[in-house]
Curated annotation (Swiss-Prot):
SUPFAM superfamilies: ACT-like (SSF55021), Ribbon-helix-helix (SSF47598). This is Putative nickel-responsive regulator. It holds the Pfam family NikR_C. Transcriptional regulator. NCBIfam families: PRK00630.1 (NF001884), PRK01002.1 (NF002169), PRK02967.1 (NF002815), PRK04460.1 (NF003381). Belongs to the transcriptional regulatory CopG/NikR family.
């Protein structure tokens, strides 16, 4: 971690008031912590948009396991991308529905492609990709 530097910013009073409400709602200790998180989030977004950066994340899927061949298709996808899908969690939500959470790692564009393919499999009721940085470049 580098040296901490103090700096000042000019901000509209109403915007600052809204920011302070957000800080309180999220439970930040102070404005500095909240601002650091916002900067990190922006940097991660840029890496995600670039497509070439190494990212990690999760693909969450909800599906009815009674749909013909669906479980097999999802498993085939996982095996096809075994280098990028580094872990899987399967939960039986009820007698029909399952939740699958896949931990993924790789270039952002590759991860997005994998997620789109999995979410697009016929029978998947809902799917979502959540990406973040590997932590190497975050300070």
């Amino acid at each position: 971690m580098g040296e901490t530097i103090r700096f000042g910013i000019s901000i509209d009073d109403k915007l600052l008031e809204s920011f302070d409400q957000l800080i309180e709602h999220k439970g930040y200790a102070n404005r500095s912590e909240a601002l650091r998180d916002l900067i990190r989030a922006s940097l991660i977004d840029v890496k995600w948009e670039n497509g070439e950066e190494e990212m990690v994340g999760t693909v969450t899927l909800v599906f009815n396991h009674h749909v013909r061949d669906l479980s097999d298709k999802l498993t085939e996808h996982q095996h096809a991308y075994h280098h990028q899908i580094i872990s899987a969690l399967h939960v039986h939500l009820d007698a029909h529905n399952c939740l699958e959470v896949l931990v993924v790692r790789g270039k952002a564009r590759e991860i997005k492609k994998i997620a789109d393919e999995l979410i697009g499999v016929k029978g998947v009721k809902h799917g979502k990709l959540v990406m973040t940085a590997t932590g190497h470049d975050l300070h």
